[in-house]
């Protein structure tokens, strides 16, 4: 009996100790013992923070002989980061300081970096990156091109540069769809199918720049499709813009919830709590891996929507007044180096790969996609530069309305979600009476001519004015949803069926 207990205790000790014994010794120094320090604000997840913090610390030690402590600041998504930077720089300007204690901004969509480059108040908050002069061979058509598929990967002033690529798409639960007798979604429009009502997982675009970009791409696809089939470009833009918003309304009406955490979507879809959702590629592929069956298949699948998604960049920038500018510039150099680029997609445990978990991100440097390098990739079959999905983002169509779009999705579909869901249920039960549908999908308040440059009041620096405008629009849409529901129920009572 004593021998058996000893064996069990020994096994338990081994299980607890094994991860510690196998773990690679941390290269990151403690705050007190480090020779250098680096403060990075980021929306990146813990896996990316850990892997890039450790890898840079080793690289910096080899280059300089100095240890470094990486101080990660993670207030939330890009919306929260913007608030931190706005308040920090406002306070810095009041006391006459150049910066606000942050060295680097790492990750998030390019919209936030463009905003920090030229904020509405004060001077530019980003400084020129030395990597452009130090490594010109990393840029150009064979490296990091300035534009691709309509997306911008660095700006003319060289104050920000894309570090890796991402693509927004659709994740879905194959088993759940089979039980419902539905085909797998292949386009944004498929998610507007009423059969998804209560089963669609969405994220709040006001909290995440990448989620907001997905909604922008959805609208722009409708606009580009309308332009192909119309003789009048102006009329086509109006029509496509309206159709885009009506599709967003369908998606919002189908939504089970709107989460602040984009990573929650593939997790819930994989578990069957939702059937499908809008999801960025690396989250979808990572969770799909976790749910793989012995035969290599997974119930969670991810697909890029046909003709409706571009290759967006996640940039990096050094902040004005960075307290540790030399180390900050070196971090950018590391991220764009061969070692930093390989880390995004190399298999865990390989010399070029992460220690703990595959990051499933795609490098931005085109020259990294050699046959030899791709043999080490987790996604070795993917080369984003060879599969664009026949979609080219056109910033002139919706770029200036980006901030307005992210606010409007919240106003139209999130703040009034209960009224919207109730109306959508009544419309489905009444078999979609045309008059009620017309009221429900009325987007005349979102006219393209008045919105294409961005709604001035929604984007106002005066918080009270912006809130009042949002309240006015919100009241309008709640009223029309309630009216559409009443019309649908009246049609049912009268026995009117289209």
Model regions and ranges:
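Early extracytoplasmic/lumenal segment of secretory-pathway proteins
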Residues: 19-119, 266-267
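Conserved C-terminal helix/tail region of periplasmic/extracytoplasmic solute-binding proteins
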Residues: 384-498
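Hydrophobic membrane-insertion alpha-helices, especially the h-region
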Residues: 6-21
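Short, hydrophobic alpha-helical packing/hinge segments within bilobed ligand-binding/sensory domains
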Residues: 80-85, 188, 265-266, 274, ...
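Amphipathic alpha-helical blocks and their helix-capping loop/short-beta junctions
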Residues: 355-405
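Extracytoplasmic ligand-binding site segments that recognize negatively charged/polar headgroups
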Residues: 43-50, 73, 79, 101, ...
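Loop/turn elements at helix/coil->beta-strand transitions in domains of secreted/extracellular proteins
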Residues: 35-38, 66-68, 100-104, 123, ...
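Extracytoplasmic/periplasmic substrate-binding proteins
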Residues: 257-323, 338-373
């Amino acid at each position: 009996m004593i021998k058996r207990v000893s064996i069990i205790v020994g096994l338990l000790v081994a299980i607890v100790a094994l991860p510690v014994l196998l773990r690679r010794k941390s290269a990151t120094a403690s705050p007190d013992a480090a020779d250098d320090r680096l403060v990075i604000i980021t929306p990146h997840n813990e896996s990316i923070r850990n892997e890039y913090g450790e890898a840079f610390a080793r690289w910096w030690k080899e280059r300089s002989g100095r240890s470094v402590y990486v101080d990660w600041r993670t207030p939330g998504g890009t919306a929260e980061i913007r608030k931190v930077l706005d308040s920090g720089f406002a306070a810095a300007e009041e006391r006459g300081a150049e910066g606000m204690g942050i060295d680097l901004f790492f990750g998030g969509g390019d919209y936030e970096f463009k905003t920090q480059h030229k904020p509405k108040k004060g001077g530019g908050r980003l400084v020129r990156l030395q990597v452009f002069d130090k490594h010109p061979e990393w840029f150009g058509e064979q490296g990091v091109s300035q534009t691709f598929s309509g997306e911008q990967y660095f700006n003319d002033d060289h104050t920000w540069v894309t570090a890796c690529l991402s693509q927004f798409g659709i994740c879905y639960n194959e088993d759940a769809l089979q039980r419902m007798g539905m085909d797998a979604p292949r386009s944004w429009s498929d998610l507007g199918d009423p059969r998804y009502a209560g089963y669609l997982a969405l994220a709040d675009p006001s909290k995440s720049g990448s989620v907001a970009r997905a909604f922008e791409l959805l609208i722009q696809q409708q606009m580009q499709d309308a332009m192909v089939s119309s003789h009048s470009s102006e009329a086509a833009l109006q029509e496509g813009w309206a159709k885009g918003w009506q599709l967003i309304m369908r998606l919002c009406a189908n939504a089970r919830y709107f989460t602040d955490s984009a990573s929650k979507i593939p997790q819930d879809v994989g578990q069957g709590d939702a059937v499908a959702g809008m999801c960025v590629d690396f989250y979808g592929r990572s969770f799909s891996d976790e749910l793989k069956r012995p035969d290599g298949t997974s119930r969670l699948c991810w697909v890029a929507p046909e003709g409706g998604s571009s290759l967006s960049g996640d940039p990096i920038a050094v902040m004005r007044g960075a307290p540790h500018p030399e180390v900050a510039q070196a971090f950018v150099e590391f991220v764009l180096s061969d070692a930093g680029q390989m880390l995004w997609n190399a298999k865990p445990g390989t010399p070029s790969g992460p220690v703990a978990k595959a990051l499933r991100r795609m490098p931005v440097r085109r020259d990294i996609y050699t046959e030899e390098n791709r043999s080490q990739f987790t996604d070795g079959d993917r080369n984003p530069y060879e599969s664009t999905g026949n979609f080219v983002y056109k910033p002139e169509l919706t770029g200036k309305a980006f901030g307005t779009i992210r606010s409007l999705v919240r106003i139209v579909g999130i703040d009034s979600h209960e009224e919207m869901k109730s109306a959508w249920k009544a419309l489905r039960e009444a078999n979609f009476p045309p008059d009620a549908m017309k009221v429900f999908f009325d987007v005349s308040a979102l006219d393209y001519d008045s919105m294409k440059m961005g709604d001035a009041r929604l984007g106002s620096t005066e918080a009270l004015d912006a809130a009042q405008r949002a309240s006015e629009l919100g009241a309008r849409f709640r009223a029309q949803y309630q009216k559409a529901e009443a019309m649908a129920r009246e049609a049912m009572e009268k026995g009117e069926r289209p």
